[in-house]
Amino acid sequence: MGKVEDNKKLKMNTLLQTAFDLFTGKGFAKTTVSDIVNQAGLAKGTFYLYFKDKYDLRDKLIAFKASQLFDDAHKALDAAVIPDFEEEILFVTDYIIERFQNQQGLMKFLSKNLSWGVFQDAVGTGSLVSQK
């Protein structure tokens, strides 16, 4: 990946993380695009290079955070030596529950904003999830 692509990815990740922090702190409704770009230290135009609006950002953030969670669970499963399928299912379920217990903000954000349609749209189009 070139320097330009690295810079783009860094800016997008900065916007995503800043939005997540604000959405979980202030709430989605009380957070503005201006709040996000000001805290991220980026120009408003940069925001619109990556997202149509705050709702588009939220949808992509849901897919991104859910994808991260499942990717992390998959990596942990790969590292564990588990003999059968049922035990694997229990392991992944326990992993996700423990992660939600340790990261209340993530659970709150996903539970308030995740609808199957939003997740399917974001994952189905491959937006953001495949850009990791």
What are the residue ranges of the model-derived segments?
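Short hydrophobic/aromatic patch on the recognition helix
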Residues: G41-F51
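Basic, helix-initiating cap at the start of DNA-binding domains
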Residues: M1-K26, T31-L42, D56, A80
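Hydrophobic alpha-helical connector segments
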Residues: K60, K75-N102
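Amphipathic alpha-helical packing segments from all-alpha helical-bundle domains
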Residues: S67, D71, G117-K132
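Alpha-helical DNA-contacting segments of helix-turn-helix folds
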Residues: R58-K65, D72, L110
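Amphipathic alpha-helical segments used for helix-helix packing
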Residues: E98-D121
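A short, Lys/Arg-enriched amphipathic alpha-helix from helix-turn-helix/homeodomain DNA-binding modules
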Residues: M12-D21, S67, D71-H74, L90
